[in-house]
């Protein structure tokens, strides 16, 4: 079981949110691969390689990925992600932009803004503006 973590970065540096996402991947268990898609993003890729628990870093360095536009990034993630059991990204503007597209392209459900990993297919997430916590189980082959 391998997990694809989509790195949140500024091309020059990795965002702290990526570390939180890797921690969630560690809670799931399995090999953790980090995708760094950007333009001139070698520094972010090097930082991703130094994160404890990361077994592989995939780099997509192209001008088309410079601004993390979901129209460009989502097809890349969907193509790469088809071979993974989980695809994770931080609940940031970028993650919220491209993950729904990735889920649609792979024809699987998306579980948004998890706060806890209970098992590889069961997660906790806030509902009702954070006033309640729902436990959600996914039967999809790829968990997003």
PLM regions: where:
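N-terminal glycine-rich FAD/FM-binding segment characteristic of electron-transfer flavoproteins
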Residues: 1-142
């Amino acid at each position: 079981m391998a997990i694809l973590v989509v790195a949140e970065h500024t091309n020059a540096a990795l965002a702290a949110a990526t570390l939180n996402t890797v921690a969630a991947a560690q809670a799931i268990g399995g090999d953790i691969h980090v995708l760094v898609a950007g333009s001139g993003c070698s520094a972010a890729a090097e930082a991703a390689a130094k994160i404890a628990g990361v077994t592989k870093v995939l780099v997509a360095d192209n001008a088309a990925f410079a601004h993390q536009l979901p129209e460009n990034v989502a097809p890349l993630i969907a193509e790469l992600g088809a071979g993974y059991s989980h695809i994770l990204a931080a609940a940031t503007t970028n993650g919220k932009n491209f993950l729904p597209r990735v889920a649609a392209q792979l024809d699987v459900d998306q579980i948004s803004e998890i706060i806890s990993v209970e098992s590889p297919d069961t997660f906790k997430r806030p509902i009702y503006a954070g006033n309640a916590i729902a436990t959600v189980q996914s039967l999809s082959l790829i968990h997003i």
